[in-house]
A protein has these predicted regions:
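Extracellular glycan-modifying ectodomains
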Residues: 1-416
Length: 416
């Protein structure tokens, strides 16, 4: 018998819903109903972080349906950017310091050293800030740290997944290339603060990641190229306020990729300064600020003649197809690429130097493995570009063994 059905004078009687319970139920209803009501009134939420909005959880996920509702509702609050901006303004205006945004004041930072009690083996995700403020105005994405301290996959499993993808691609007669775009906090670690949440656990995994993954998977390690490029430039390859490399980094990646496929092919390239335009920085948006940085692009003539770049904005959620007439200095084998946002700053130069290339987002492999398999089967070269934080953190679901197997079956039926 439920306690609420007992007589009120019974010592075990408990009302089904007390006053506090009703308040909690009303608050929960308002929280989850607010996105629906805002959508009905015409308000639309926009991505605040460097990722798509969380999708509505499926009822087939069991308890995952209920745990996923929080992310869905939070992401779809149309006034979320204004709320973040208000919190930041109050914190700086009243208290004279930035809002913590997930960090917890006081105590020893998780993974931050400093002696005392040992940190828990599994740090609380709420301790990690969205943004890490470095010296001289440098801002770093908090996921550079949190994903390494709270990885979804062990490094051995990540390496196994990458090797399996290489195996299924090469077994079909195709060439395979993997490029790793390093985190800004890796390339410019000297601008990180001395103390921050997760410092030690991030450094440990980062060191092991770069020591093992390129050698074990045959990946193209962009770190030496970017450091040499930075040494020869007046401006850093990354801006202080965005988590992505500039076009100079994207162009350097394309050059490394082309040379790996056809050594010497870039000797005829003519690269000159191109147009400039303003681009919204992604990191300040996480603390409610709207800042822009000046993008300096390039022209690229693969044969030393006319510029062949094309600027087509895309997040690759819808595959981007780029074709042009083959010229000297170009890779003319059909190439199919899985890439994330770092390649957005490289796509003009891929268009200039690859006569037939299609780029799709890693999320597409999970949502439509058959469609991605058919796309990859159109190419003779398959290339992956993965960012360090997502790869080291095991955040690419396509690294699961069944994903490579499903796509590999399609490639096997369509050999080169």
């Amino acid at each position: 018998m439920h306690e609420a059905w007992l007589p009120r004078e019974h010592p075990l009687h408990r009302p089904r819903h007390g006053a506090k319970q009703y308040v909690a139920l009303v608050c929960a209803f308002l929280f989850f109903a607010a996105p629906v009501l805002a959508w009905t009134l015409g308000a639309r939420a926009k991505p605040l972080e460097n990722r798509p909005l969380a999708s509505f959880p499926s009822v087939t996920e069991g308890w995952g349906f209920f745990t996923g509702l929080n992310d869905w509702a939070s992401d779809r609050l149309a006034f979320r950017p204004q709320a973040v901006h208000a919190v930041e303004g109050i914190s700086e205006g009243v208290f004279g310091e930035p809002a913590p945004h997930g960090s917890e004041p006081g105590g020893t930072p998780v993974g931050g050293g400093g002696g005392g009690e040992q940190p828990p083996s599994t740090p609380d995700p709420a301790l990690f800030p969205d943004v890490i403020r470095g010296e001289d105005g440098w801002l770093f994405l908090g996921h550079d740290v949190s994903y390494k301290c709270l990885p979804d996959m062990e490094l051995d499993r990540i390496i196994t997944g990458l090797r399996r993808w290489r195996s299924v691609v090469e077994a079909s007669g195709r060439e395979f290339r993997l490029v790793i775009a390093p985190d800004k906090s890796t390339v410019y670690s000297e601008h990180m603060p001395d103390e921050y949440v997760g410092r030690d656990c991030m450094r440990r995994l980062r060191s092991e990641f770069w020591r093992r993954v390129p050698e074990a998977t045959g990946a193209i390690d962009m770190r030496p190229t970017l450091r040499e490029l930075d040494r020869r430039r007046d401006d850093p390859v990354f801006t202080k306020i965005d988590t992505h490399w500039r076009h100079a980094g994207g162009l350097a990646m394309v050059r490394r990729l082309a040379e790996s496929l056809d050594p010497g092919v870039t000797t005829t390239w003519k690269v000159e300064p191109g147009r400039t335009y303003q681009h919204r920085a992604d990191i300040p948006a996480l603390v409610g600020k709207d800042r822009e940085w000046t993008v300096r692009s390039y022209s690229l003539a693969p044969d030393g003649g006319a510029d062949n770049t094309r600027f087509l904005g895309s997040d690759f959620q819808e595959p981007l197809r780029l074709e042009s007439r083959a010229r000297p200095g170009m890779i003319d084998e059909p190439t199919r690429m899985i890439a994330d946002s770092f390649t957005q700053f490289a796509s003009p130069y891929l268009a200039a130097s690859f006569s037939d290339i299609t780029i799709a987002h890693p999320d597409n492999v999970l949502s439509d493995p058959e469609g991605v398999g058919r796309m990859l089967a159109e190419g003779e070269v398959v290339t992956f570009e993965f960012s360090e934080r997502f790869l080291a953190g095991g955040r690419y679901a396509m690294l699961a063994p069944d994903m490579a197997e499903r796509v590999g079956e399609i490639l096997k039926r369509n050999p080169v």
